[in-house]
Amino acid sequence: MAKVESFTLDHTAVKAPYVRLITTEHGAKGDVISNYDLRLVQPNTAAIDTAGLHTIEHLLASLLRDRMDGVIDCSPFGCRTGFHLITWGEHSTTEVAKALKSSLEAIANDITWDDVPGVDIKSCGNYKDHSLFSAKEWAKLILSRGISNDPYTRQVV
């Protein structure tokens, strides 16, 4: 089986919340794609409930695109501790952390249910599994801990 970087990461050594560049891939025609670890909660100590995580996912899909160029996708980890962010080009972890922080601030303070995209039967594959209340509570908790641009040394942006 192929070696997967995220399964070689020492999850006991990282200090969430943080942004980590996992890899930058260069295509045959010169295109560049970057993959980031947006770790919101400490691995093996907490996990975001699925309804809250699902709502955060829908909101980050839009909010990160408003704050950064080149966002391709933002998808949750199966362990429910954060997200993969895939982008065109290369962004510093500081730039990504600032965009994430601003997005979580919007979720915590400004977003209403009417702002959450894709929450009906036609636009979501599990539309009943959402919680804006949970998303807001998690956003507040994550922000209170600060988002680092380094996974091992706390460098809060």
UniProtKB/Swiss-Prot annotation:
Catalytic activity: S-(5-deoxy-D-ribos-5-yl)-L-homocysteine = (S)-4,5-dihydroxypentane-2,3-dione + L-homocysteine
Alphabetized GO MF terms: iron ion binding; S-ribosylhomocysteine lyase activity
Organism superkingdom: Bacteria
Binding sites annotated in the UniProt record for Fe cation: 54, 58, 124
Known EC number: 4.4.1.21
Keyword terms of this UniProt record: Autoinducer synthesis, Iron, Lyase, Metal-binding, Quorum sensing
Co-factor binding comment: Binds 1 Fe cation per subunit.
Required co-factors: Fe cation
The keyword Lyase belongs to this UniProt entry's keyword annotation: yes
Matches recorded under InterPro entries: LuxS_sf, Metalloenz_LuxS/M16, S-ribosylhomocysteinase
Pfam families given in the database record: LuxS
SUPFAM superfamilies, per database record: LuxS/MPP-like metallohydrolase (SSF63411)
Assigned protein family: Belongs to the LuxS family.
PANTHER family assigned to the protein according to its UniProt record, in alphabetical order: S-RIBOSYLHOMOCYSTEINE LYASE
Function of the protein: Involved in the synthesis of autoinducer 2 (AI-2) which is secreted by bacteria and is used to communicate both the cell density and the metabolic potential of the environment. The regulation of gene expression in response to changes in cell density is called quorum sensing. Catalyzes the transformation of S-ribosylhomocysteine (RHC) to homocysteine (HC) and 4,5-dihydroxy-2,3-pentadione (DPD).
HAMAP family: LuxS
Subunit details: Homodimer.
Record's protein name: S-ribosylhomocysteine lyase
Gene: luxS
